[in-house]
A protein has these predicted regions:
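Positively charged n-region of N-terminal signal peptides that target proteins for export
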Residues: 1-4
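Hydrophobic h-region of N-terminal signal peptides that target proteins for export
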Residues: 9-17
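Cleaved targeting-peptide boundary
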Residues: 18-25
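N-terminal targeting signals for Sec/Tat export/insertion, comprising classic cleavable signal peptides
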Residues: 28-52
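Charged, amphipathic alpha-helical segments
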Residues: 36-42, 68, 559-568
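Extracellular interaction modules
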Residues: 37, 59-68, 537-543
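Structured surface patches comprising rigid loops and adjacent beta-strands/short helices at the edges
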Residues: 38-46, 63-75
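A composition-driven surface/loop motif
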Residues: 77-646
Length: 646
C-alpha cells in the first residue's frame, strides 16, 4: 500500500446552501502521476482501503492504494524538468471562493454615456422612475405587508406569495423580510425596478422572483455585507399554463443587475437566474448555486453580459453549466468565478454526451476585459466553450467564434474522458460519442488579440488545453497551457505576435493542421514517448519572423520556402539541457530537457539563425553549470537545417 501524506486538517464550509460561503479550498489527489482536483471540501475520512471526501453535500470515494499523496497545492515535478524556471509560477493558481477577497473586487461597470450604445438603457440611472417611496413588500414568514405607491398597482396575495399587475411606467419595488414559502410575481407592460434589501425567500414550488413582462427588469441588490439577500426555489414547479418558469429568478425580458449588495441564489429545478432575453450584470456580488442536472446557474437566451461586479457560480448537477447563453456571451469587466462539479451524461435524443461547462455560448463569445476563473472537476468537464456544431449528412458546420481582447483568464479541469476508452472500428479509428475535458474550446475561429490566458488540464486522457475546430489566430497576449493531452489543437494557426507556452505530459504540445508564423514567441513541449512538440501534420509550415522552440521526441520542420531559418536536431542520449550557440560558443538559446527523452528532438527558429553562418548544438548532462559537450558543429545552408535523425 502506498503511503498517503495528509498535509493539513480540513474543516471547511459546505457549499450547498444559498448562504454566504466561507473560504473554501481545493485538494489535489495524486494518483499514478495524474492529479485529480476535489473542490469544496468539508472533511476527509479513512478506512484501510478507502478514502472518503465529503464535499458540497455529497461524497467522493477514492482508493487508498492508488493514491500517492494529497496536497493543498498541486504536486507536480514535470514542469520543473521540462520548462524554464521563468514559467513555473504561471501555473500556480487556484479557483475557489473567498468572501473577504472577492468583496474587495466589487467594482461597478463604467457608465455608458452614449445613447446610441446598445447597453445604454441597461443603466437604471438612464430612466425616469415614479416619484415617492415606491412599493414596499415586507415578507414575514406566512404573510407579506405591502405599503407605498399602491395606486399604480393591483395586488393579489396568497399567504406570502405576492402577485402584482401594473400598466404604469417607472414603478419600483423594495422587497425585504423572510419567508420559507413565498414569492414575488410581476406582470408589467413597462420597465420595472425591484430592489432586494435583506430579503430571504424560499418558494418550494416555483420561481422566487418571476417577471412575466417583456420589458427590462432592473434588479438592484442593496444592504452590503450585513444585509445580504438569499433566494431558494424547490426541485419541482407548479405549472402555469402559457408561462415560462425557467429558474429561481426569471424574466421574460432583460435582467439588469446592479447595486452594492450581495445576492445568493440556491437553484434546484432549472436555472438560478434566467432571462428569455439577456442578463446584464453591472455591479454587486452575485453568487448562484445550481444543483439541477443540465441546469444553468445564469442563463440568457440571447446574451449574457458581465460588465462589473463579482459573479460566482457553483454547479454540482451532472451536465450543469455556470454561465450559459443560447446565442452570445460578452465579458467587458468584473470578476467571474465559475465552478462545475458534475459529470457528463448521455442524452438519448441527441445520441451524444452532454458535459459540464463553466462558461458556454452557443454562438460568438467575446472576452474583452475583467478576470475570469473557471474550474471543472467532473468527467468531460470544460472551462470555456464557444459555439456549436451543425451536422448534416454531407458536412459538419462549425458555428460560433471566440475572441480574447484583454481579459485575464484562468482555467482548470480535473476530469477525464467519458467513457474512458472510446470504441474503435476495424481500422483502429475511434468511433462513437464521448465527452472529453477541455480547458477552452471554440467551434469556429479563435482569435487572441490581447490579455492573459492560463489553462491547466490535469485529469487524464483526452484532457486538452485550447482547441479550435477552425483556426487560432494570435496577434498578442500571453498564453500558458499545460495539459495531459494536446496543449493546443487547431485546424491551423496564424501567429503574428504574443507570448505562448504550450506543454503536454502525454501527447503533442501543439497539434495544428498548418502554422504560418510572422511574429511572437512560441514555446511548445510534447511528451517524451513518441510525441511531438510541434505537429503540423506535414502541411503548410512557414516562418517569416518571431521565435519557435519545440521540444519533443519528434517535431515537424518548417518548409524550405520559409524566409526565416530554422534548425531541427535529434540527440540519442540523456541530457538535462540543450543549447543553440554561435560558432564561438556564445549561447543563443538554452532549454531544459528531461532525461526521459530518447530520442530528444528540438526545433529552434529565430532571427539569430542566418543562412551562411556557423553554429553549435551544446548539451549539458546534469545542469547548465556543467561544462557543455558539443554535439554538432554546422553551417546553415538552407532555411531548414536538420541534424541527426529519429
Amino acid at each position: 500500500m502506498k503511503k498517503v501524506f495528509l498535509l493539513a486538517a480540513f474543516s471547511l464550509a459546505v457549499l450547498a446552501q444559498a448562504q454566504r460561503v466561507e473560504p473554501q479550498r481545493n485538494i489535489y489527489v495524486n494518483q499514478g502521476g495524474r492529479t485529480r482536483i476535489v473542490n469544496a471540501v468539508d472533511s476527509i475520512g479513512f478506512t484501510p482501503d478507502q478514502m472518503t471526501v465529503w464535499r458540497a453535500g455529497d461524497t467522493t470515494m477514492l482508493n487508498v492504494a492508488g493514491t500517492d499523496r494529497i496536497t493543498l497545492s498541486e504536486y507536480d515535478t514535470w514542469r520543473t524538468q521540462v520548462m524554464p524556471e521563468t514559467y513555473w509560477a504561471d501555473f500556480d493558481y487556484d479557483i475557489a471562493f473567498d468572501n473577504a477577497a472577492d468583496r474587495q473586487r466589487i467594482v461597478p461597470e463604467p457608465e455608458i454615456t452614449d445613447p446610441t450604445d446598445p447597453c445604454y438603457d441597461d443603466f437604471k440611472a438612464h430612466h425616469t422612475w415614479r416619484p415617492g417611496l415606491g412599493v414596499h413588500i415586507t415578507f414575514n414568514d406566512t404573510t407579506a405587508v405591502i405599503t407605498g405607491d399602491l395606486d399604480s398597482i393591483t395586488v393579489t396575495r396568497n399567504g406570502a406569495h405576492v402577485t402584482v399587475h401594473t400598466a404604469a411606467s417607472g414603478v419600483w419595488f423594495v422587497l425585504s423580510g423572510h419567508s420559507n414559502n413565498g414569492s414575488f410575481k410581476l406582470y408589467s407592460e413597462k420597465k420595472a425596478s425591484v430592489t432586494l434589501s435583506g430579503l430571504h425567500l424560499t418558494n418550494p414550488s416555483g420561481p422566487v422572483i418571476n417577471s412575466q413582462g417583456k420589458k427590462r427588469l432592473f434588479l438592484e441588490v442593496t444592504g452590503g455585507v450585513l444585509n445580504y439577500s438569499s433566494l431558494t426555489d424547490g426541485p419541482t414547479y407548479t405549472k402555469v399554463e402559457g408561462e415560462d418558469q425557467r429558474g429561481c429568478i426569471f424574466a421574460e425580458g432583460k435582467i439588469c443587475i446592479s447595486g452594492d449588495g450581495e445576492l445568493y441564489v440556491n437553484a434546484n429545478k432549472k436555472c438560478g437566474i434566467a432571462s428569455d432575453d439577456y442578463v446584464h450584470v453591472l455591479d454587486g456580488l452575485v453568487h448562484v448555486v445550481n444543483h439541477a442536472e443540465k441546469g444553468k446557474a445564469i442563463y440568457g437566451k440571447d446574451n449574457i453580459i458581465i460588465g462589473g461586479g463579482v459573479v460566482r457560480t457553483y454547479s454540482d448537477g451532472d451536465a450543469g453549466k455556470g454561465l450559459a447563453s443560447d446565442s452570445l456571451l460578452t465579458v467587458t469587466g468584473g470578476l467571474i468565478k465559475a465552478i462545475t462539479a458534475g459529470n457528463a451524461v448521455y442524452v438519448e435524443a441527441e445520441q451524444d454526451y452532454s458535459s459540464c461547462c463553466c462558461i458556454k455560448s452557443a454562438w460568438n463569445m467575446h472576452l474583452a476585459g475583467g478576470e475570469i476563473r473557471c474550474l471543472s472537476t467532473g468527467t468531460g468537464g470544460k472551462g470555456i466553450s464557444a459555439g456549436h456544431e451543425e451536422v448534416t449528412p454531407t458536412k459538419t458546420y462549425y458555428r460560433g467564434k471566440l475572441t480574447f481582447d484583454g481579459a485575464d483568464v484562468y482555467v482548470r479541469t480535473g476530469g477525464t474522458r467519458f467513457p474512458a476508452v472510446k470504441l474503435e472500428d476495424s481500422h483502429g479509428n475511434a468511433i462513437g460519442p464521448a465527452a472529453s475535458p477541455k480547458g477552452i474550446k471554440s467551434a469556429d475561429k479563435m482569435t487572441i488579440n490581447s490579455g492573459n490566458i492560463y489553462v491547466r488540464c490535469s485529469g487524464g486522457a483526452a484532457a486538452e488545453g485550447i482547441e479550435s475546430k477552425r483556426s487560432i489566430d494570435i496577434y498578442g497576449g500571453k498564453v500558458r497551457t499545460y495539459c495531459v493531452d494536446d496543449g493546443m489543437n487547431a485546424e491551423g494557426c496564424n501567429m503574428h505576435g504574443g507570448d505562448v507556452l504550450i506543454c503536454s505530459t502525454e501527447n503533442d504540445g501543439f497539434d495544428t493542421g498548418f502554422l504560418i508564423m510572422s511574429g511572437g514567441l512560441l514555446y511548445t513541449i510534447g511528451d517524451d514517448d513518441e510525441q511531438m512538440g510541434l505537429d503540423t501534420d506535414g502541411k503548410t509550415f512557414l516562418v517569416s519572423g518571431g521565435e519557435i522552440v519545440a521540444l519533443g521526441a519528434r517535431n515537424c520542420a518548417p518548409f524550405n520556402s520559409s524566409s526565416q531559418a530554422s534548425v531541427l536536431c535529434y540527440l540519442h542520449k540523456n541530457v538535462s539541457g540543450l543549447a543553440l550557440a554561435d560558432a564561438t560558443g556564445n549561447i543563443l538559446k538554452a532549454i531544459p530537457t528531461p532525461y526521459s527523452y530518447n530520442p530528444l528532438c528540438v526545433l529552434f527558429s529565430n532571427s539569430n539563425i542566418q543562412i551562411g553562418s556557423s553554429y553549435q548544438i551544446l548539451s549539458f548532462e546534469h545542469s547548465f553549470n556543467d561544462t557543455p559537450v558539443t554535439e554538432y558543429n554546422f553551417t546553415v545552408e538552407t532555411s531548414t537545417t536538420q541534424l541527426g535523425s529519429k
